UniProtKB/Swiss-Prot annotation:
Organism from which the protein derives: Pseudomonas fluorescens (strain Pf0-1)
EC number(s) stated in the UniProt entry for this protein: 2.1.1.77
Primary site of residence: cytoplasm
PANTHER family on file: PROTEIN-L-ISOASPARTATE O-METHYLTRANSFERASE, PROTEIN-L-ISOASPARTATE(D-ASPARTATE) O-METHYLTRANSFERASE
Name of the molecule in the record: Protein-L-isoaspartate O-methyltransferase
Reactions it catalyzes: [protein]-L-isoaspartate + S-adenosyl-L-methionine = [protein]-L-isoaspartate alpha-methyl ester + S-adenosyl-L-homocysteine
Amino acid sequence: MTSQRTRERLIQRLYEEGVSNASVLEVIRRTPRHLFVDEALAHRAYEDTALPIGNNQTISQPYMVARMSELLLEAGPLDKVLEIGTGSGYQTAVLSQLVERVFSVERIKVLQDRAKERLIELNLRNVVFRWGDGWEGWPALAPYNGIIVTAVATDVPQALLDQLAPGGRMVIPVGSGEVQQLMLIVREENGFSRHVLGAVRFVPLLNGPLA
């Protein structure tokens, strides 16, 4: 079901689970998640669960999309955000309605192409895409005052730390297998502060672009 009632039920659940940023909740409410999943799974699009999108990848659980977006925005508005892992484009679409510009890197070309089409369909024009290795970030356009990583890294990539602007915030899952933690990293005057926010489950952040 993709009815407004189904979407409202999801928003109520996210609120009850602790997502409190009104802008994030409103963007989740109006973003048609069913466009970002296979047609056969469209009836499950507004369940609070991750769903397969092919190529051994998933569209993230709506709670995780909302929570990671909220964490990025906690210190105020952002004008330049780097997303590592475009995937289905759903997180990209949500971010693009919350920040001024999104720069999104994806290693799987077919996923990136589909995501581009969906964002064009939704008339979301403030996103620039790069096909490449997420571990490297997008150094040519750095620095970024927000970085969001949608796959789990075994450690925080140094390249991404280097591309974070002073005062910038990075939200990233770190770990491997069953042991993964969501982290918030803030670039401060004398280094980086790291905050562990709890257990999560993401697909791995892999090296190298794929056609």
